[in-house]
Amino acid sequence: MSTTSEIRRTFLDFFVKNGHQEVASSPLVPLNDPTLMFTNAGMVQFKNVFTGAETRPYHRATTSQKCVRAGGKHNDLDNVGYTARHHTFFEMLGNFSFGDYFKEQAIDFAWRLITEEYALPKDRLLVTVHTSDEDAAGLWRKVAGLPDERIIRIPTNDNFWAMGDTGPCGPCSEIFFDHGPKVAGGPPGSADENGDRFIEIWNLVFMQFEQLTVDQRVALPRPSIDTGMGLERVAAVLQGKHDNYDIDLMRALIEAIASAAGTDPDGPHKVSHRVIADHLRSACFLIADGVLPSNEGRGYVLRRIMRRAMRHAHMMGCVDPLMFKLVPALNREMADQFPELNRANALITETLKLEETRFKQMLDRGLKLLAEETGDLASGDSLPGPVAFKLYDTYGFPLDLTQDALRPRGIGVDTAGFDAAMARQREDARKSWTGSGDHATEAVWFDIRDRVGASEFLGYTSTDAEGAIVALVVDGKVVESAPADTEVAVIANQTPFYGESGGQMGDAGEIRLAEGGKVVVRDTAKKLGALHVHIGRVEGATIRVGQAARFVVDTERRDALRSHHSATHLLHEALRRRLGEHVTQKGSLVAPDRLRFDISHPKPLSAAEIRVVEDDVNREIRANAEITTQIMDPDSAIEAGAMALFGEKYGEEVRVVSMGRREPGANRPFSVELCGGTHARRTGDIGFFKIIGEGAVASGVRRIEAVTGQAAFEHIEAQDDLVSGAAQLLKVTPADLPGRIQALLDDRRRLERDLADARRKLATGGGGAAAPAVVEINGVKWVGRLLEDVPAKDLKGMVDEVKKQLGSGVVALIAVADGKASLVVGVTEDLVGRFDAVALVRAGAGAIGGKGGGGRPDMAQAGGPDGAQAGAALAAIEAALAG
């Protein structure tokens, strides 16, 4: 029996042997395609090749593409675990021809692979073709010798593939394996085609048309091939299994789950083992590709997947986090093919552990509410939609998790009511949102761009240039002129002013009008990716469309921005080298006085890590290496080692910024990134780099704040002033300051202990203090005492001391501080049957304005805002004892 890994390798090697380029799987976050949430097919990374928008140095390719289908059109999440073949994560084996071979060779390759390399019996194979595709039917007869009864014609779109409403498209031919008459189900196209007897293992797409409009389709001059074979499906067939979860790879994960959880993988929690095995793969690969759990977008889908798996772990009785313990098992099975799992191992492990810890807290609250709301519901009933929405909105309980939790009891969910509650909340939010006003002028920017075209940016080589005013906007409206003292947005045909984008703030400066007067520019924005919009105030004259002007950037501010931007690149690379390649940019701000950089990392940076990252950056700064830029196409840039941001859409050309030393044996300088911002000329121009802050901004996302150049110098001066000032106050040298502070802290802790001990003695009558007055009520010893300025946290210990002295009795101590009262009542063990400390403390709480009180029968506490009534509270407790 071949393993799943061997089946994958056989496929790839077969096509390499037949002239195909083996191409690595693209990330699950599609590069350069923000229209897709996740990569869901092998052809995604070749989409632009098929459309002709991109060329590759090969015309044939083969891949094993990692895919996720969970959300949107392709959503298998709800079925995972309950069926034999649904997955959120799967591998798609594929071979592709870009205008090279077509139907006959594609069919020949497919037939030879499955019958010779995989040795599947020919008499158990059948195919489908589109009704209109007689070419394919004839080729299956010619190449494979298939009789007509095993070539099934399908008239529906199941056998016709299209990239979208327009673009490349064509008929499909699917290959099916027959498990035999002992398995229920009919052939494709029959009434019972959804049975398990006939299983699709490969889909061949013949891209031979281009859809121009709904009604117009023309032949492509260079038809292409796109095929997809589900690795898990073909592995099940080759290993003699009817269920994808029984193949060796999935079984290894399921056994690891059972071992870690102490459960039977084939027992009552069989479905849960399958869910966790599938979702573990999705979660780990998504994290490795830069997605982190959050409440929106891809991060929200990841969180749903993770929490569904964690819910099933809870159902299996797992008290402690489970999923992070399974990462080594996944790495053993898949890291050889996908080394990113090893590179991101620390991030994956920490993210899973942190998310599961948080989820368990949420789950306990949510399940308690769910149990309360469904206590009277029986099988066949439905949970009201507003209740399901409350679980989601208040407790973070996704709808699918609620449905999953109720499924074993046969209880449904009113999804229409849930959707209505969601819609009401969104409408309320929309009505309460006043907005920034930008939406009111968006049409204006489109109109200007269509009329005057894009602004030409001159700022990479100049900070002072001539230009012409081509448009003016005042209060969201296009105008022909603007008088002095008017706030205005100015668009020119060309400008050296950088418009805010990529995290870098826009330039400031002046627009000096040829006819006198100027615009003091406080900021520059970039609209629609094309217009550089100078925002400022007109001074000294009227500005008019058509005027010539001189555009002068504030060079001191620009230099500070360039310094911080270049330092951000060096910081990014230093973090990846020191913390791991899982570190990716999650956000940034480049300002004149600081930089802010958000990264994917599961835990705080230690002081040692911060120091070594600073040292790495400053080492590159001291090297004073040249910072270079180069214009390249995106694929060439990435192949050359440039870092690109996941999901970022790049044009046909990108700007590659390289900086730092080229170390011996390295094929690139220290940092190489795709970037459109402005940068220093040499690393030495940055001056000095200092990290001034590090903290969390979201789960798995850390924020680093740093300064460079003059800002770094000013920060160090300020820190030096603080240290010198503190040393003067304590009358020590700066070098002796840490020791002096530690001595003061030690003295404070000692004095706090002494004070607490003195208060305790005061309450109990020790240390020369008068013994507490003991009164007997109904044969029970009673001590009630008012204490001034005693911390509430000390009262319990004092009550315990008095209880010990009494041996048997009831104690009530009230501390009054800042006008507020804190009350603690204690009852010795022998009297708990007669008196309840909770009832007694509640009797006294009312007098001091408290609401209730709580604790145990032997010790309870309460508080209230009216410390002046402390005596009345003690009297109320005495009355309760006497009653």
Curated annotation (Swiss-Prot):
Catalytic activity, EC: 6.1.1.7
Subcellular location: Cytoplasm
InterPro entries: aa-tRNA-synth_II/BPL/LPL (IPR045864), Ala-tRNA-lgiase_IIc (IPR002318), Ala-tRNA-ligase_IIc_anticod-bd (IPR018162), Ala-tRNA-synth_IIc_core (IPR018165), Ala-tRNA-synth_IIc_N (IPR018164), Ala-tRNA_ligase (IPR050058), Ala_tRNA_ligase_euk/bac (IPR023033), DHHA1_dom (IPR003156)
An example Gene Ontology CC term for this record: cytosol
Binding site residues for Zn(2+): 565, 569, 675, 679
Record note on cofactor: Binds 1 zinc ion per subunit.
Pfam family, one: DHHA1
GO MF term set: alanine-tRNA ligase activity; aminoacyl-tRNA deacylase activity; ATP binding; tRNA binding; zinc ion binding
Major enzyme class: ligase
GO terms for biological process, alphabetical: alanyl-tRNA aminoacylation; negative regulation of DNA-templated transcription
Cofactor dependence: Zn(2+)
Keyword tags: Aminoacyl-tRNA synthetase, ATP-binding, Cytoplasm, Ligase, Metal-binding, Nucleotide-binding, Protein biosynthesis, RNA-binding, tRNA-binding, Zinc
SUPFAM superfamilies: Class II aaRS and biotin synthetases, Putative anticodon-binding domain of alanyl-tRNA synthetase (AlaRS), ThrRS/AlaRS common domain, Translation proteins
Reactions this protein catalyses: tRNA(Ala) + L-alanine + ATP = L-alanyl-tRNA(Ala) + AMP + diphosphate
Domains (record comment): Consists of three domains; the N-terminal catalytic domain, the editing domain and the C-terminal C-Ala domain. The editing domain removes incorrectly charged amino acids, while the C-Ala domain, along with tRNA(Ala), serves as a bridge to cooperatively bring together the editing and aminoacylation centers thus stimulating deacylation of misacylated tRNAs.
Family, similarity comment: Belongs to the class-II aminoacyl-tRNA synthetase family.
Function: Catalyzes the attachment of alanine to tRNA(Ala) in a two-step reaction: alanine is first activated by ATP to form Ala-AMP and then transferred to the acceptor end of tRNA(Ala). Also edits incorrectly charged Ser-tRNA(Ala) and Gly-tRNA(Ala) via its editing domain.
Name of the protein in question: Alanine--tRNA ligase
Organism: Rhodospirillum rubrum (strain ATCC 11170 / ATH 1.1.1 / DSM 467 / LMG 4362 / NCIMB 8255 / S1)
